[in-house]
A protein has these predicted regions:
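Short glycine-rich substrate-engagement loop in P-loop NTPases that contacts/grips substrate
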Residues: 18-21, 68-102, 113
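Conserved AAA+ ATPase "sensor/coupling" helix adjacent to the nucleotide-binding pocket
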Residues: 89, 150-151, 155, 164-179, ...
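Short regulatory helix/loop adjacent to the ATP-binding pocket of P-loop NTPases
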Residues: 120-124, 139-153
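A short helix-loop-helix "switch/interaction" segment in the helical subdomain of ASCE P-loop NTPases
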Residues: 43-49, 184-205
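Loop/turn-to-beta-strand initiation segments
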Residues: 38, 95-103, 116-118, 126-133
Length: 224
C-alpha cells in the first residue's frame, strides 16, 4: 500500500497534528524514568489514520528504545496469559545502552475487561526502564475499570487539518510523478468531492486512494 511508503518515521513527517510538538517536548522532560516506568496514551475520538501508532514508534526511538527493544501488542488477541508473560518479560532490560524497552498496545480499546484490570496492575508497578504506550480511537474505553484511564499521561490527536493534508498529497503526487488532471483540486479530494468516499481526514486513506482518484477524475474529464 502506498501509505506504507509514507508512514511517518520522524517528528517532521507528521501532518496536521499539533499534538506532535507536545509529545516531542515531553520526550525531553528531565524526570522521565526517574524511579518508575512511563505510561503514555495517544488517543483520538473516533479518528483513525491520524498518526497515533506511528507516533508511538517515533516516541519509543526518541526515548532511547531500539527497534529490538520495542514490542507491539495486538489488543484484539491479547489474553490474560499474554499479560502475565508480559509482566515477567518487562523486567528484562533492552539491548540499548540505557536498557529501556517500549511496549505499544495498539487499539487498546479492544482489550477485554479482565485484561484491562490486569493492565491496571501492570501500570501501577512498571519497571523504571519501561514505557508502555497505548493507542486508541476511543475516549471512554476504560470507563468500566476504575482508575485505569487516570493512570496514563494522555495526548489527544485531532482531526487533521484538510489544507495541510491537501498540501501533503500534492507533494506526494509530485514525488511519484503522478499526472494531475486539469481542474483537479487536492483540497476537494480530501473533502470527498472527487468521486471517492474517504473516511474523514484519514491521511492513510487519502494517500492509498489518491492514484485511483486521479485516474477516475481524468476519465470523467475525457468523457465530458
Amino acid at each position: 500500500m502506498l501509505s506504507e511508503k509514507y508512514r511517518p518515521t520522524k517528528w517532521d513527517d507528521f501532518v496536521g497534528q499539533p499534538v506532535i510538538e507536545d509529545i516531542k517536548a515531553a520526550c525531553g522532560d528531565s524526570w522521565l524514568f526517574d524511579g518508575c516506568g512511563e505510561r503514555w496514551l495517544f488517543e483520538s475520538e473516533n479518528i483513525a489514520g491520524c498518526g497515533k501508532t506511528c507516533a508511538a514508534y517515533v516516541t519509543a526511538r526518541a526515548l532511547g528504545c531500539s527497534e529490538f527493544a520495542t514490542e507491539r501488542i495486538d489488543s484484539r488477541s491479547c489474553t490474560i496469559a499474554d499479560l502475565r508473560e508480559l509482566a515477567t518479560s518487562m523486567h528484562t532490560y533492552g539491548c540499548g545502552g540505557n536498557g529501556r524497552r517500549a511496549f505499544i498496545i495498539d487499539e487498546i480499546q479492544h482489550l477485554g475487561q479482565a485484561c484491562q484490570r490486569m493492565l491496571l496492575g501492570l501500570l501501577e508497578s512498571l519497571p523504571k526502564h519501561v514505557i508502555v504506550i497505548g493507542t486508541t480511537t476511543s475516549t471512554n474505553w476504560a470507563d468500566d475499570v476504575d482508575g485505569l484511564y487516570s493512570r496514563w499521561r494522555r495526548f489527544r490527536f485531532r482531526k487533521p487539518n484538510a489544507p495541510e493534508i491537501a498540501d501533503h498529497l500534492e507533494r506526494i503526487a509530485g514525488e511519484l510523478g503522478l499526472t494531475i488532471p486539469p481542474g483537479f483540486r487536492f483540497i476537494s479530494y480530501v473533502q470527498g468531492k472527487c468521486g471517492i468516499e474517504l473516511k474523514g481526514n484519514n491521511i492513510r486513506d487519502c494517500i492509498d486512494q489518491l492514484p485511483d482518484a486521479l485516474r477516475r477524475y481524468k476519465g470523467k474529464a475525457r468523457a465530458a
